[in-house]
Amino acid sequence: QDKIDPKMVQYQDSPKDGNKCSTCVNFEAPSSCKIVAGKISPNGWCIAYAPMEDKKG
């Protein structure tokens, strides 16, 4: 499946409201994303941001 152009999801290289790629379920370290194309910063953000579940339970 083709990944989405970063412009389509309003990708930015900086966090938004404390949310960032490194805490998103779609982020794949060190610098890629399951759904957004291209090099992705761990400190970036886009409208597809989905926070990881807190594992502390």
From Swiss-Prot:
Q: Which gene encodes it?
A: hip
Which species expresses this protein natively? Answer: Rhodopila globiformis
Which SUPFAM superfamilies would you find in this protein's record? HIPIP (high potential iron protein)
- State whether it acts alone or in a complex, and with which partners, per the record: Homodimer.
- Can you tell which superkingdom this protein's organism belongs to? Bacteria
Spell out the molecular function terms from Gene Ontology: 4 iron, 4 sulfur cluster binding; electron transfer activity; metal ion binding
Kindly give the Gene3D superfamilies that the UniProt entry links to this protein. Answer: High potential iron-sulphur protein
From the UniProt record, give one GO term of the biological process aspect. aerobic electron transport chain
Show the PROSITE patterns listed in the entry.
HIPIP
Any idea what this protein is called? High-potential iron-sulfur protein
Record function comment? Specific class of high-redox-potential 4Fe-4S ferredoxins. Functions in anaerobic electron transport in most purple and in some other photosynthetic bacteria and in at least one genus (Paracoccus) of halophilic, denitrifying bacteria.
Q: Which InterPro entries match?
A: High_potential_FeS_prot, HIPIP_sf
| UniProt entry keywords in alphabetical sequence | 4Fe-4S, Electron transport, Iron, Iron-sulfur, Metal-binding, Transport
